[in-house]
């Protein structure tokens, strides 16, 4: 703030620094959305009924979602869940998570498409020193959700390009799903500032599990749709 006070308010540097500070203040450090449930058995029954409304059949999928909810409810202070929904196009993978899991758990839903992504910077931002730089999609999800434990849905994991730039994206996803490191995630725009992603619920969707990096796949609870 002292640097800001010393700058000319009409200068580009003033606007750039003020935007940076405002963005930091918008990150919901330490703010979590919690499930306030008094009767868990009743809550599960209601959750199953709500899932039946948005998912026709697919009892195995609904069972997995209820299992995730049970694990989460048993210890809301533990690390988030990492799982993947896979199957052919058009079977409702996004609907299952957006209208099913997220609503049942009362958590903000965030959608990130990996298909066609050029490099990892769209996820972890660009350095503040670059003109026009900004933070990445992951921090954007936290800011929009106003909490550190939203659902973040990565679509088309198997469509990441098989190039060095694609490998950058995969390596970043490996990093944010590593529970020994993801409490200290750093967006390049906010270099030096640790951001806790350990409470996020990461969901990956894909058609072909054979195209997924083995290290990343080992961390994902797979749900066939």
Predicted features along the sequence, with ranges:
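Conserved catalytic/switch belt of AAA+ P-loop NTPases
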Residues: 156-195
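Pre-Walker A (Motif I) flank of P-loop NTPase domains
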Residues: 77-83, 148-150, 200
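A short beta-strand-to-loop transition that corresponds to the Sensor-1 phosphate-sensing loop
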Residues: 155-157, 178, 199-209
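A short helix-turn-beta junction within AAA+ P-loop NTPase domains corresponding to the substrate/partner-engaging
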Residues: 107, 213-225
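Walker A/P-loop
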Residues: 78-114, 143-144, 174, 214
């Amino acid at each position: 703030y002292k640097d800001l006070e010393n700058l000319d308010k009409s200068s580009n540097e003033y606007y750039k620094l003020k935007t940076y500070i405002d963005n930091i203040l918008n990150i919901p450090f330490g703010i979590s959305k919690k499930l306030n449930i008094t009767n868990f058995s009743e809550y599960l029954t209601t959750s199953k009924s709500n899932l039946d409304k948005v998912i026709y059949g697919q009892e195995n999928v609904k069972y997995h979602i209820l299992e995730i909810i049970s694990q989460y409810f048993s210890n809301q202070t533990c690390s988030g869940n990492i799982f993947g929904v896979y199957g052919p196009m058009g079977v409702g993978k996004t609907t299952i998570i957006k209208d099913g899991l997220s609503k049942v758990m009362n958590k903000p839903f965030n959608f990130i498409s990996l298909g066609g992504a050029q490099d990892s910077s769209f996820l972890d931002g660009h350095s503040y020193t670059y003109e026009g730089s900004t933070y990445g999609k992951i921090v954007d999800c936290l800011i929009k959700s106003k909490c550190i434990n939203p659902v973040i849905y990565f679509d088309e994991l198997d469509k990441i390009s098989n190039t060095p730039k694609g490998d950058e994206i995969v390596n970043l996803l490996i990093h944010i799903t590593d529970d020994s490191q993801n409490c200290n995630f750093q967006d390049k725009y906010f270099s030096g500032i640790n951001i806790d992603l350990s409470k996020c619920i990461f969901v990956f969707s894909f058609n072909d599990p054979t195209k997924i990096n083995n290290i990343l796949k080992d961390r994902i609870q797979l749900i066939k749709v």
